[in-house]
Amino acid sequence: MKKLFSMLVAAALVGTMAMAAQAVPQVPADVVIDHLSNPNAKLEYKVKFSHKAHASLGTDAAACQKCHHKWDGKSEIGGCATEGCHADTTSFKATEKDPKFLMTAFHSKSPMSCQGCHKEMKTAKKTTGPTACAQCHNQK
């Protein structure tokens, strides 16, 4: 009886671990964000983004939802330019405040944006990513 109980407990643990492994989304190591293009700009719009470095801040649903704020925690995670999120790529003004603009996803003061989160961390004297234009965008 003890042997049967031990086997059932072991099977339950293996099943639980397998389900947990499936729940964690696969994270690409690096991503190139290149949805915007402005030939008149002095800086490149294309940005190399280390998804792996950001994923190291946490792999639970809440950590992913810090940036992927429309993700339900179960379905496939979409990028910022996904329809229904920041799909409008027509604005090149970093001061644009409408959340539908892709530029807003990266440059607003909100802690859900790249720049907003980095500045919030910098204010809290935590290790952070870039907060100035040329730190992300290369000169043309």
Swiss-Prot record:
<feature type="binding site" description="axial binding residue">
    <location>
        <position position="69"/>
    </location>
    <ligand>
        <name>heme c 2</name>
    </ligand>
</feature>
<feature type="binding site" description="axial binding residue">
    <location>
        <position position="54"/>
    </location>
    <ligand>
        <name>heme c 3</name>
    </ligand>
</feature>
<dbReference type="GO" id="GO:0009055">
    <property type="term" value="F:electron transfer activity"/>
</dbReference>
<feature type="binding site" description="covalent">
    <location>
        <position position="67"/>
    </location>
    <ligand>
        <name>heme c 1</name>
    </ligand>
</feature>
<feature type="binding site" description="covalent">
    <location>
        <position position="136"/>
    </location>
    <ligand>
        <name>heme c 4</name>
    </ligand>
</feature>
<dbReference type="InterPro" id="IPR020942">
    <property type="entry name" value="Cyt_c_III_dom"/>
</dbReference>
<dbReference type="InterPro" id="IPR002322">
    <property type="entry name" value="Cyt_c_III"/>
</dbReference>
<feature type="binding site" description="covalent">
    <location>
        <position position="117"/>
    </location>
    <ligand>
        <name>heme c 3</name>
    </ligand>
</feature>
<protein>
    <recommendedName>
        <fullName>Basic cytochrome c3</fullName>
    </recommendedName>
</protein>
<feature type="binding site">
    <location>
        <position position="44"/>
    </location>
    <ligand>
        <name>Ca(2+)</name>
    </ligand>
</feature>
<feature type="binding site" description="axial binding residue">
    <location>
        <position position="68"/>
    </location>
    <ligand>
        <name>heme c 1</name>
    </ligand>
</feature>
<comment type="function">
    <text>Exchanges electrons with [NiFe] and [Fe] hydrogenases and with the acidic cytochrome c3. Participates in sulfate respiration coupled with phosphorylation by transferring electrons from the enzyme dehydrogenase to ferredoxin.</text>
</comment>
<feature type="binding site" description="axial binding residue">
    <location>
        <position position="118"/>
    </location>
    <ligand>
        <name>heme c 3</name>
    </ligand>
</feature>
<feature type="signal peptide">
    <location>
        <begin position="1"/>
        <end position="23"/>
    </location>
</feature>
<feature type="binding site" description="covalent">
    <location>
        <position position="114"/>
    </location>
    <ligand>
        <name>heme c 3</name>
    </ligand>
</feature>
<feature type="binding site" description="axial binding residue">
    <location>
        <position position="86"/>
    </location>
    <ligand>
        <name>heme c 2</name>
    </ligand>
</feature>
<keyword id="KW-0813">Transport</keyword>
<feature type="binding site" description="covalent">
    <location>
        <position position="80"/>
    </location>
    <ligand>
        <name>heme c 2</name>
    </ligand>
</feature>
<keyword id="KW-0763">Sulfate respiration</keyword>
<feature type="binding site" description="covalent">
    <location>
        <position position="133"/>
    </location>
    <ligand>
        <name>heme c 4</name>
    </ligand>
</feature>
<dbReference type="InterPro" id="IPR036280">
    <property type="entry name" value="Multihaem_cyt_sf"/>
</dbReference>
<feature type="binding site" description="axial binding residue">
    <location>
        <position position="107"/>
    </location>
    <ligand>
        <name>heme c 4</name>
    </ligand>
</feature>
<feature type="binding site" description="covalent">
    <location>
        <position position="64"/>
    </location>
    <ligand>
        <name>heme c 1</name>
    </ligand>
</feature>
<dbReference type="GO" id="GO:0020037">
    <property type="term" value="F:heme binding"/>
</dbReference>
<keyword id="KW-0732">Signal</keyword>
<keyword id="KW-0349">Heme</keyword>
<feature type="binding site">
    <location>
        <position position="45"/>
    </location>
    <ligand>
        <name>Ca(2+)</name>
    </ligand>
</feature>
<feature type="binding site" description="axial binding residue">
    <location>
        <position position="137"/>
    </location>
    <ligand>
        <name>heme c 4</name>
    </ligand>
</feature>
<keyword id="KW-0574">Periplasm</keyword>
<keyword id="KW-0249">Electron transport</keyword>
<dbReference type="GO" id="GO:0009061">
    <property type="term" value="P:anaerobic respiration"/>
</dbReference>
<feature type="binding site" description="covalent">
    <location>
        <position position="85"/>
    </location>
    <ligand>
        <name>heme c 2</name>
    </ligand>
</feature>
<keyword id="KW-0408">Iron</keyword>
<dbReference type="GO" id="GO:0046872">
    <property type="term" value="F:metal ion binding"/>
</dbReference>
<dbReference type="GO" id="GO:0042597">
    <property type="term" value="C:periplasmic space"/>
</dbReference>
<feature type="binding site">
    <location>
        <position position="36"/>
    </location>
    <ligand>
        <name>Ca(2+)</name>
    </ligand>
</feature>
<keyword id="KW-0479">Metal-binding</keyword>
<feature type="binding site" description="axial binding residue">
    <location>
        <position position="51"/>
    </location>
    <ligand>
        <name>heme c 1</name>
    </ligand>
</feature>
<feature type="binding site">
    <location>
        <position position="34"/>
    </location>
    <ligand>
        <name>Ca(2+)</name>
    </ligand>
</feature>
<dbReference type="Pfam" id="PF02085">
    <property type="entry name" value="Cytochrom_CIII"/>
</dbReference>
<keyword id="KW-0106">Calcium</keyword>
